[in-house]
Amino acid sequence: MLWRRKSFWLALSAFWLLLVLLGVFPLRLAVLPGPLPGRSQGWPRWLDAAFLQSFSQSETNPEDVAQLPRVSRGSSCTWGACFDTSKCRGKVLKIFVHSPAGPTSEAQRRILDSLEGSRYSALSPADACLLLFLPSQDRRGACGPLPPNWNGGRNHLVLSLYPAPCTRLGQAMVAEASPSSDIFRPGFDLALPYLPEAHPLRGGAPGKLQQHSPQPGATLLAVAEEKGRWRITSTHASACLWDRHCEQDPGPQQTYPGETLPNATFCLIPGHRSATSCFLQALQAGCIPVLLSPRWELPFSEVIDWTKAAIIADERLPLQVLAALREMLPSRVLALRQQTQFLWTAYFSSVEKVIHTTLEIIQDRIWGASGHPSLMWNSPPGALLALPTFSTSLQDFPFYHLQLGSGPGSSFSAVIWVGASGESLLKLIQEVAGSRHCAQILILWNSEKLPPDRWPETAVPLTVIKGHRKVSNRFFPYSNISTNVILSLDAQSTLSTSEVDFAFVVWQSFPERMVGFLSGSHFWDEAQGGWGYRTGMTNEFSMVLTTAAFYHRYYHTLFTHSLPKALRTIADETPTCVDVLMNFLVATVTKLPPIKVPYGRQHPEAVPMDSGDPRPVPEPQPLDQDCINRLAAGFGHMPLVSSQVRLDPVLFKDPVSVQRKKYRSLEKP
């Protein structure tokens, strides 16, 4: 009896194994390989490759033969062997661009423009630790004459926006578009996206995702074709979508140009390099890229976890791929589509972002363990807007409290910009110091007169910093600031302690945004053909004035060390423009409007409610309407976001006893 049971289970096990080998259970699993030193991450591998002996030698794609030459690039080169980090003073990446030999091409000019005025630029080769070579490639793939001080390519980066590999590179790193896997050196070379010729230099268009959830019934599927066109069908179609030898009818389909890619859920992209131009189209459209056995390196795969935004599939298993796409959970689809939009906006929407991402990866290699962690690269706002020089702890940034489960801080530092002393300044100090959340007060003395010998007695430390005449210096990251939260004020600001307390409590719920009392709004002026802005009381707003606003101190670091010098110069030349510039910066990071809280009394820069107001109101400072247009041109787009919401305390102006209200002074005239 026991022998019969053993025989039965042995036969059942053999039958089950036979079913698996014959493909009766077609769904395959994909897992991530363990991290290997010097290898790019984010590539799944298929567990059942050994079971598909008939596909072990895949046929060569004739389209790839002429595009994948095997080029000697110094295959033994690694980061430690071929790059001298000792030349980077203070471990800060500075680059010098060799002048292109011959006429400057359009691609070279766009690269040079993206680096102009950036924090990476150096004036001479002696000040740089990385020399940038922009090859003038011909049809044969030759780089042209090598620059002086080539030194075998050591500490050089050969950068090309197009997939045209060069020869005679020696120890130089190569950053090119869609490099083939057989010549790419992981951990040393860099993979760029294939950019169209009309790709914007700065800013760039936002993502085009219109519908987060797939259409009910059938999920739309787009298949990349030649010349940037797409075939549209559904996941219920046959498996002949990408099989060149299939003679069956692939089912109903429509063809669209890449510019009008509809709101498809999945975009099937063949593995040959001629299809790489479709990758960014899918990313911008919010269409999940399904890469069919790609033979090219995904862009920035060294730092971007593409498993959160794309699917790597085996083109030899069409039935299994379609079945897996049909069975994907809606929550997984939503997460993938949201990640495509973040990656597009953070790293790929402009030439400037692509070039700066390339350099930031090299900067991370120089820093080593002090560089950007994976969370910064793969979650908003992205590594380009999260500077590790600010802090090595994620808790010190305003963006990651939700992921880390930490709090933004329980106290603030008041920073008061003083152009002239007066009674209003002394009263403001007393009101701010009376807040239970105030930790310190810093006076930025900008007056030609000497500061007073005596200041009001306060329960918190008061520090005076002299000699800062530039308006942009009010946003300098002073080492005296001891808290993560800043209350930015002017000497003419008039706030009560209750107003300060309530605004700070609101900021604690929105630590990445600005919370202010006085607002402004931008608008498009059809008559002038440009942007305009106004301050005062309107039905919507997109800015808060920094004369009375809470924000995270990280924005001082970003303002000083990330913004191009040309933009800060605009603010210094036009003092009323500094508020606009700070709001541009925060809106670029958050993609959200600021928060407005109630303000109970008139401010010198605010517009009076009506002409019958009995209180004398000083003339508002004239606004330079050209400022906002110059800033929009510098950013490459208009980042400001409008809002019609103001946050008030509970019971604010409700017909109840004032004794029941927590912030009573907010309603006092």
UniProtKB/Swiss-Prot annotation:
One of its GO terms (cellular component) is endoplasmic reticulum membrane. It holds the Pfam family Exostosin_GT47. It catalyses: 3-O-{[(1->4)-beta-D-GlcA-(1->4)-alpha-D-GlcNAc](n)-(1->4)-beta-D-GlcA-(1->3)-beta-D-Gal-(1->3)-beta-D-Gal-(1->4)-beta-D-Xyl}-L-seryl-[protein] + UDP-N-acetyl-alpha-D-glucosamine = 3-O-{alpha-D-GlcNAc-[(1->4)-beta-D-GlcA-(1->4)-alpha-D-GlcNAc](n)-(1->4)-beta-D-GlcA-(1->3)-beta-D-Gal-(1->3)-beta-D-Gal-(1->4)-beta-D-Xyl}-L-seryl-[protein] + UDP + H(+). It is a single-pass type II membrane protein. One of its GO terms (molecular function) is glucuronosyl-N-acetylglucosaminyl-proteoglycan 4-alpha-N-acetylglucosaminyltransferase activity. Residues 601-621 are annotated as: Disordered. It is an enzyme of class 2 (transferase). It comes from the Eukaryota. Belongs to the glycosyltransferase 47 family. This is Exostosin-like 1. The lineage of its organism: Eukaryota, Metazoa, Chordata, Craniata, Vertebrata. The gene is Extl1.
